[in-house]
Amino acid sequence: QSSISSTYDTTGGFKYDADTKTLTLRNCTIDTYTKASSEQLSGIFKYYNVFLDSRNVGTLNIVLEGRNYIGDSSSLKYMPAASDVNTPRYLGIWGNTVRFSGSGSLTVEAQTFPIQSGGIETSGSVDLTLRSYMNGTVTRSMAVGAGTSVTAETKGNNLDFYALNVKNNLTVNGTLNATTKGCVYQNDYPVALLVGGTLRVVGGQVTATSDGRNGNDGCQGYGIKANALEIGGGGSVRAYSNGYSTKTSQYDGKEAIYVSSNLTVDLGGYLYAKTQNPILSNENENGALKVNGRWDLSGTNGDTAYTKAVITKPVNGSIYENVILGTTVS
C-alpha cells in the first residue's frame, strides 16, 4: 500500500483515482512500507523504508477526510551515521509535488523526513502534523493555505536536526508551527524553520521554536533562518531560541530570527523574536534578531529603514520598541 501505482479499493479507508492522480484518505492508517534505494552517496545508508512512495505519479493530490495516519511511531529513534549501511531509515511520504485538500487531518510519523518532496501545498481546512526524530520535512517549495494548519516537529536532540527545510520559497496564509530539539554547540544548525528563499507570511501565523534546553549541554538553535522575510496583511511571526551553555557561560550565537538578506514588515504585520538563556556573559555580541540586508518598514513607519546588520540584545529589545510601530522584539 506504500507505492501509488494502481487503483485501490476502499477496504482500507482509501481510494485512488489514476486519471486525476487523487488519493482520498478517510480515517485511514498506512503503516506498511516498501524498501527503496536511498540514492545517497557510497558509504552512506543505502535504503529507506517508505510508507508512501508517489515519485512515479508526478503531482499527487491527497484529499483528507476524518483522522488519518501514515508511518510508525516506533521508528521515532536515533540512528547514528556509523550504523550498518544496509539498515534502512524510515521515511514518510516521498514524492514530487504533494497537494493536500479536504476537511480532515493527517499525522505522519517517521524516523526522518515525514515528507521529502518537490513541493507541498495545503488548502481547504486540512490539519497536518509532520513528526520525526531525526531531520524533519524537506521540500523545494511550500504554500500553507488560508484555513489550514501545519505542525512540523523534530524530537531528537542527538544532532543539529531541523523541523522544516524549504529550499526555495515558503508562503503562509494559514498557520505553521515548527519545533526542533536538535542540539549542536556553535554549529550553523539546528534550525526549527529553514527557508532558502523568501518566507512570506500574508495574513497567516508562523511560530518557530528551537528548544535546545531539552538537548545536550551547551546548545542554542535558530528559530527561523531565512534568506528573506516578508510579513504583511495582518500576518504574524513569532520565533524563539531556547538554549543554554553551563560549560562556557556564553551565549551560543544563534538568533531567534536570522535573515541573510532583507526584512519587510508591512502595516499590520507582527514580529516577535526572543532568546531564552539563563547564562549570558556575552549578551551584547548576539541577540534575538539579526538582519544582514535592508530593513524595509515603510508600510509600518515611513521614517524607518536600515541598510546594515542590526542586532538586538537577547532580552532587552527597547532599541526597537519606539522604532517599529506595532512590533515587539525582546
Locate each region found by the language model.
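A composition-driven surface/loop motif
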Residues: 1-330
